[in-house]
């Protein structure tokens, strides 16, 4: 955003990026009086911490979900309720992980780190070590949901982290993908609308 000039009025960052935009000064506070629908959001999303600074709201969430742990139930029998699945030797070469920061957070949870969004240098080093340990097991780091769907359809992978769409598409096509609910917990995400600095004066922004 810093180097792109004033070519847009709004930007939609995920929750782990939104505060960086606020701190960088490239977005401005949102006038919630001009967004009446914001008051009808679930309470947890009306003034979330990652969009709050100096008593002001800096964005409005519009979607949310979880990063799922998914396995092909026809090929993975009795999977553990754990994030350990992608690190299991039993699935060497049959694992796919998202090429995204969320995989770093997932790995940190698996490593037992309490606050995966604010790691110390030592915790980050531990997470890196665990990630590298699992790298030889990974068939491919997926980038898009369509890419991951293809990997499952072709039988190239049997376990991954995934978006909700991967499960939905699999069920629609009759494939037996199931979600694991890990004891270590899962990652959640939100996308929000923020207002580029100076764009609030444009009535079309709201």
Please give the residue ranges for each predicted region:
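Paired acidic/hydrophobic, glycine-rich loop segments that form the ligand-binding mouth/hinge
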Residues: 8-12, 141, 158-163, 179
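Extracytoplasmic ligand-binding site segments that recognize negatively charged/polar headgroups
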Residues: 8, 12-153
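Periplasmic-binding protein-like
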Residues: 125-134, 173-197
